[in-house]
C-alpha cells in the first residue's frame, strides 16, 4: 500500500473493514471503480468471487510463470508439456500423477487430454488461479479440493473427466480407463462403485458412452441402498438398466455378494 495516497489508503482500509476482503482485492476493486468507495463495495458484493479471482490474476508475475513453463516444456515441442514434464511438475508438487489432486489441477487448467498440457492451458490455468510458482499452487490445492463439496462443481469436474480421459479421436471411453477414473472420482460417493465396476468388467467389456458416464452420477445420487426406487421406465441408459437387474439379487441377498 506504500505507493497509494493517504486518502486511497483510507479507502482501502474502509473497504476491507466493510467487505472482509484482502488488501489485494480491495485495491483491485477500488481501482476498477475509480476509487469510489460506495460503488466499489456495491460491485464487490454483487460478485465477490470474480473480484477475488481477478485480483489474484493481476498478482501473477508473467515472466516468472514463463520461466516455470520452460522448466516443464517438451524439448521436441515448446508449445506443450509432455509426459516427462507432467511427471516433473507432479514431483515438484509432491503429488502422485494418478491422484485426484492432479485431476483437479487439469480441470482448473481446462486440459483437453491426459498426460499433457498445452502452453496456453498451463499459462492461462496458472494465471486464473493466481499462481506463478508450484509453491503457490501447492498452497492453493486444499481450497480447490474443498470446492468439490459443491455438487455443481463436482458435477463439472466429473463431466470434464470423461473428455479428459478418452483418446481424442474416440467417441467413447475405453472400459479399463473408465473404471480407473470412476475409482478415482466416485470413491466414497457412489455406494455401488465396486459392484458397478465388477459388472462392467464381467458383462460389458466395451467402451463407455458419454451419456452413460454422465448419468451414472445422477443415478448414484438418487438410488436407494436396496435399489427399490429405481424406475425401469425412466430415461436411463440400457447399461444402467442391466446393472440394476444384475445388482438387485446381490444387494437384497438373493445371491451371495462377490465382496
From Swiss-Prot:
It is found in: Cytoplasm; Nucleus. One of its GO terms (biological process) is positive regulation of protein neddylation. This is DCN1-like protein 2. Keywords: Cytoplasm, Nucleus, Phosphoprotein, Ubl conjugation pathway. GO terms for molecular function: cullin family protein binding. Pfam families: Cullin_binding, UBA_4. The DCUN1 domain, also known as PONY domain, mediates the interaction with different cullins. The DCUN1 domain mediates the interaction with the N-terminally acetylated NEDD8-conjugating E2s enzyme leading to the NEDD8 transfer from N-terminally acetylated NEDD8-conjugating E2s enzyme to different cullin C-terminal domain-RBX complexes; the neddylation efficiency correlates with the DCUN1D5-cullin and DCUN1D5-E2 interaction affinities. The keyword Phosphoprotein applies. Transmembrane segments: none annotated. GO terms for cellular component: cytoplasm; nucleus. Interacts (via the DCUN1 domain) with the unneddylated cullins: interacts with CUL1, CUL2, CUL3, CUL4A, CUL4B and CUL5; these interactions promote the cullin neddylation and the identity of the cullin dictates the affinity of the interaction. May also interact with regulators or subunits of cullin-RING ligases such as RBX1, RNF7, ELOB and DDB1; these interactions are bridged by cullins. Interacts with CAND1; this interaction is bridged by cullins such as CUL3 and strongly inhibits the neddylation of CUL3. Contributes to the neddylation of all cullins by transferring NEDD8 from N-terminally acetylated NEDD8-conjugating E2s enzyme to different cullin C-terminal domain-RBX complexes and plays an essential role in the regulation of SCF (SKP1-CUL1-F-box protein)-type complexes activity. Signal peptide: none annotated. Residues 8-45 form the UBA-like domain. Highest levels of expression are in the skeletal muscle with relatively lower levels of expression in the heart and brain. Very low levels of expression in the kidney, liver, spleen, lung, ovary and testis. It comes from the Eukaryota. The modification Phosphoserine is found at residue 55. Residues 60-248 form the DCUN1 domain. Gene3D superfamilies: Cullin, PONY binding domain, DNA helicase RuvA subunit, C-terminal domain, EF-hand.
